[in-house]
A protein has these predicted regions:
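Active-site neighborhoods and metal-handling regions in enzymes and metal-associated proteins
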Residues: 1-229
Length: 229
């Protein structure tokens, strides 16, 4: 309806203005920042609770995922901020896995990617743990991903380009022998939506500003084996 109507007005030139709004939303004011901090603190508690639930070893991925909305509500959230990911073993190599009836086996990795909606603002956090046993390969990949995460986080300050933060983490993982196994952007902006406009990726040379809120989530995904994020 709108586009044909615009075509009828010859003397006017229309420009899409959504990017202007998106850029304003990239920077959060102090009140918004505090809400984001509170949302993330709640997410810390929920992640710990989910890890303890998984440690019992008697629930499927789906059964764990189905409990999450209630857990978030118990901690003051409206519910999930996105469809949760709880992925056991080889399922963790699919970074968009949807929970199924898979059960835990000793030596499985558990990728937990969850978030809650708190007073209109989203959290998003990923953690990887291992059930009962950890192989040398799993430990090495975990430590590599953690090294990349810490190095990227250490770069974050006003004036640093988002693409350079992405490159820092990607280079470290490549030095560890993995390139195509890190198959997504390093991070995304978070706020009232869990995925707001803007990426921490090679596609964005925007400089960091105080008040920006975004994720840093490097990963390595070994098909048929396990994933770490």
């Amino acid at each position: 309806f709108l586009m044909p109507l615009m075509d009828l007005v010859d003397e006017c030139h229309f420009e899409l203005g959504s990017e202007c709004v998106d850029r304003v939303r990239m920077v959060k004011d102090e009140k918004e920042q505090q809400l984001m901090i509170e949302a993330s603190k709640i997410n810390d508690l929920v992640v710990d609770e989910v890890i303890n639930i998984c440690a019992k070893g008697n629930l499927t991925e789906k059964e764990v995922s189905d409990q999450l909305a209630g857990i978030y509500q118990k901690h003051g959230c409206t519910g999930n901020s996105f469809e949760p990911i709880v992925a056991y073993g080889k399922n963790g190599a699919d970074n968009h896995h949807s929970g199924d009836d898979s059960t835990l086996k000793p030596g499985d990795s558990i990728v937990i990617d969850i978030g809650g909606l708190y007073k209109g603002y989203c959290s998003d956090m990923t953690r990887t743990v291992f059930y009962k046993e950890v192989s040398p390969k799993q430990k090495a990949v975990y430590e590599l991903v953690l090294k990349a995460q810490k190095a990227a986080e250490a770069m974050i300050k006003p004036g640093v380009r988002l693409c350079d933060i992405d490159k820092c983490a990607r280079d470290i993982i490549a030095e560890g022998g993995y390139t195509v196994e890190f198959n997504h952007r390093l991070g995304h902006f978070i706020g009232r939506d869990v995925h707001e406009w803007g990426d921490v990726s090679q596609n964005y040379d925007i400089e960091v500003q105080e008040g920006m809120t975004f994720s840093i989530e490097p990963g390595v995904y070994l098909q048929g084996e396990f994933g770490v994020r």
